[in-house]
């Protein structure tokens, strides 16, 4: 009832806003600029694209002062982007319409495709991309399996960087913020129109942490990030251009520290006296105060290299060929305290190496007849290696050590290596039945193989040849799409679509013994039926879009416990396909130019998420129980963002002020819906101001002014029997900057 009331209230507000706006629109002389998107692998007006997509231009992005894509979560309905804080490289939890994954392990494939310059980022670590030198951002909601492929069951975040201009020029930005934060961004363009070059450099250093470690009374949470990008663009002839982009990134930071939320019945409290004082309150009493008895300053590191080669060839007036080669490698090191206490109960030293290579070739038609299409071939290879040391201080509970002494720590060394090879063919065709009705049909066939090799031993690199722990598995899948759109007039589009997405199966990357590491789990699929309209009203001064969707989730992959006689505690956590779920909802987007100075943007997402079937074992008893009553993770029934922008001429320059409020409804962050990690409603308020004088911009920004401290991650270890940990979002931040264009 509360959700229905909230939706009714927001809907009334929207139509009141439209009515009020229509009264004053006559004072404005400028209309809304056309937004061009590439959501369907070709350039289209966003209002003529028959799918749910939100988009930001370069100017929109700059005026919001985002650090990374997390700061853009409010730009789309039904979108949550959280930093999992479970390692360097900002492992990311992206949930669109309640569909997502929140885990750092690389065997957990993404549900949302983060795509940079046409290249898919294949792991959650490194997916929290920095918003540097971006030309556009597109957020596609719903399965995008046809054109973007596997692991896009929730949607796609498509980012495109600016191209070299071929002229000498550039931009330098220098900024400073609280927590002793320094920002330096630079862009240099040079060359000629036929051989254009661009160098982008970035240094962002937060020298003071926002956390206090109660063990040594020093700060934690510091971070330093640097990036250098070289971009070249060559015009081979009038019909072909080749672009090469090389990016090197380095991130050094304090390892994140978990908060202990274990209550009276948990092992942490009952046995070791490490207790939470109340529901949702950490042991420290404050979400920004932690216990870390092995603090190491900036010892967590993430190194990344990305190379992208793209060939764009206009074969003729009717056909265009695109080829994209993407190569990405990462190397991460982190020693992390997970128990959230002054003791060493569970710490990990977790290093990981990852690499991916992708090839995509596609042909796009531009025919004069009723039929046009995109057809292509895609190849993907990736692998990762993790040698991990777990330092466990609670084995005494299972008779593994002679006494209940938290000073006795048992090291366990796990080695995991997994590989993925995938190939796919895809197509999507539009057929104009008449001048108003278009039928779209598409599909993608995927053939994928994964392998896993794992073992334990007395040292960090045990000999896996001593035991047969290798396994591989092959899956195939066809994901279809059918849509029909009706262009009622040049300002109004209706559409109805059916699409399907596929998320890969795999092998457990987090395991208790070698044999659970080679136990496969199946792929999962999401099927979406969606109806929508896109409208441009009031003489091109109001854009209003609406979508209604019904998504069915099959073979949902979740972590469960199984009996395991080989494990020291008699149980093991594995990934299995244990649930079916439904996600239904409504999405509204509105942008209005009130007059030549004032504009309003609003998006609203209503979501009804539930499990249809959920039978699993979370106690290691061997008998699954019915958990259908639980709510899916990060699936608030209501999200909305309201932005107000005012621009005016102030003296010799141009002033700009934007204020926004981003509301996230109450939701769970732990799979078992622990009330300890439950997030109440949050409303994050941001403010940005700038003054542009000739080629210089002076700016101020503030984020999370309301200091919302909701949890970005929550986990019940052994179904909450051992302890529950969580980590909170960053507090309020502010900064100033000067940008000079030359």
Give the residues covered by each predicted segment.
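Solvent-exposed loop segments that connect transmembrane elements
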Residues: 210-219, 256-293, 338-348, 389-415, ...
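Transmembrane beta-barrel wall of Gram-negative outer-membrane proteins
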Residues: 169-171, 176-206, 211, 215-257, ...
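Acidic, small-polar-rich N-terminal luminal/periplasmic segments of exported/outer-membrane proteins
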Residues: 31-167, 531
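N-terminal Sec signal peptide and the immediately downstream disordered periplasmic leader
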Residues: 1-66, 70-74, 238, 274, ...
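C-terminal beta-signal and adjacent terminal beta-strands/loops
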Residues: 662-670, 690-742
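Gram-negative outer-membrane beta-barrel transporters
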Residues: 373-374, 435-439, 550-552, 576-671, ...
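Structural signature of Gram-negative outer-membrane beta-barrels, strongest in the C-terminal barrel
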Residues: 233-237, 363-366, 372, 376-380, ...
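Membrane-embedded beta-barrel scaffold of Gram-negative outer-membrane proteins
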Residues: 190, 308-336, 487, 493-503, ...
């Amino acid at each position: 009832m509360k959700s229905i009331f909230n939706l009714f209230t927001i809907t009334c507000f929207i139509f009141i806003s439209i009515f009020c706006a229509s009264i004053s629109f006559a004072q404005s002389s400028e209309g809304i600029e056309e937004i061009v998107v590439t959501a369907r692998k070709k350039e289209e007006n966003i209002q003529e694209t028959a799918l749910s997509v939100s988009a930001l231009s370069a100017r929109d992005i700059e005026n919001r002062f985002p650090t990374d894509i997390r700061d853009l979560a409010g730009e789309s309905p039904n979108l949550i982007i959280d930093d999992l804080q479970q390692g360097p490289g900002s492992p990311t939890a992206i949930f669109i319409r309640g569909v997502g994954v929140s885990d750092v392990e690389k065997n957990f494939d993404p549900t949302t495709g983060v795509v940079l310059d046409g290249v898919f980022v294949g792991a959650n670590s490194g997916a929290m991309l920095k918003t540097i030198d971006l030309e556009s951002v597109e957020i596609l909601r719903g399965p995008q399996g046809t054109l973007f492929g596997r692991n896009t069951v929730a949607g796609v975040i498509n980012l495109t960087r600016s191209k070299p201009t071929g002229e000498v020029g550039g931009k330098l930005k220098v900024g400073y913020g609280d927590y002793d934060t320094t920002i330096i961004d630079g862009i240099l363009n040079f060359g000629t129109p036929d051989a254009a070059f661009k160098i982008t450099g970035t240094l962002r250093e937060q020298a003071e942490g926002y956390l206090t470690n109660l063990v040594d009374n020093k700060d934690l949470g510091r971070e330093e990030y640097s990036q250098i990008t070289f971009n070249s663009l060559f015009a081979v002839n009038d019909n072909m251009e080749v672009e090469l982009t090389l990016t090197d990134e380095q991130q050094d930071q304090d390892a994140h520290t978990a908060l202990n939320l274990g209550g009276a019945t948990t092992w942490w409290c009952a046995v070791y006296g490490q207790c939470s004082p109340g529901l949702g309150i950490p042991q420290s009493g404050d979400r920004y105060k932690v216990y870390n008895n092995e603090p190491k300053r900036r010892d967590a590191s993430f190194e990344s290299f990305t190379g992208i080669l793209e060939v764009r060839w206009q074969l003729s007036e009717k056909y265009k060929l695109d080829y994209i080669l993407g190569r990405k490698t990462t190397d991460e090191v982190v020693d992390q305290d997970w128990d959230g206490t002054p003791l060493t109960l569970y710490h990990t030293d977790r290093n990981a190496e990852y690499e991916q290579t992708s090839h995509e070739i596609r042909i796009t038609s531009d025919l004069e007849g009723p039929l046009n299409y995109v057809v292509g071939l895609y190849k993907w290879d990736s692998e990762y290696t993790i040698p991990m040391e777990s330092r466990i201080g609670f084995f005494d509970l299972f008779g593994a050590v002679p006494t209940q002494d938290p000073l006795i720590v048992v090291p366990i060394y796990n080695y995991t290596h997994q590989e993925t090879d995938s190939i796919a063919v895809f197509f999507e065709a539009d057929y104009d039945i008449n001048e108003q009705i278009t039928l779209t049909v598409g599909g993608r066939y995927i053939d994928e193989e994964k392998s896993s090799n794992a073992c334990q031993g007395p040292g960090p690199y045990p000999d896996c040849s001593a035991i047969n722990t290798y396994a591989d598995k092959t899956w195939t899948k066809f994901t279809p799409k059918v849509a029909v759109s009706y262009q009622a007039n040049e300002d109004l589009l209706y559409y109805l679509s059916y699409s399907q997405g596929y998320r890969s199966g795999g092998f457990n990357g987090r395991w208790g013994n070698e044999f659970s590491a080679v136990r496969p789990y199946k792929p999962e699929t999401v099927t979406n039926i969606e109806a929508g309209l896109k409208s441009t009203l009031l003489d091109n001064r109001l854009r209003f879009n609406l979508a209604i969707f019904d998504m069915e989730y099959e073979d949902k992959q979740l972590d469960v416990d199984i009996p395991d006689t080989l494990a020291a505690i008699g149980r093991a956590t594995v990934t299995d396909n244990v649930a079916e779920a439904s996600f239904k909802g409504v999405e509204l987007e509105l942008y209005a130019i009130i007059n030549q100075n004032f504009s309003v943007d609003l998006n609203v997402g209503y979501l009804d998420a539930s499990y249809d079937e959920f039978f699993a074992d979370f106690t290691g008893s061997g008998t699954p129980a019915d958990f259908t009553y639980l709510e899916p993770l990060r699936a608030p029934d209501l999200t909305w963002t309201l932005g107000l922008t005012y621009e005016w001429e102030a003296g010799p320059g141009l002033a700009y002020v934007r204020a926004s409020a981003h509301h996230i409804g109450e939701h769970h962050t732990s799979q078992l819906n622990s009330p300890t990690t439950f997030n109440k409603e949050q409303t994050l308020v941001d403010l940005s101001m700038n003054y542009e004088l000739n080629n210089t911009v002076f700016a101020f920004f503030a984020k999370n002014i309301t200091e919302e401290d909701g949890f970005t991650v929550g986990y019940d270890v052994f179904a909450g029997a051992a302890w529950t940990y969580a980590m909170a979002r960053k507090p309020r931040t502010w900064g100033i900057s000067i940008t000079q264009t030359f």
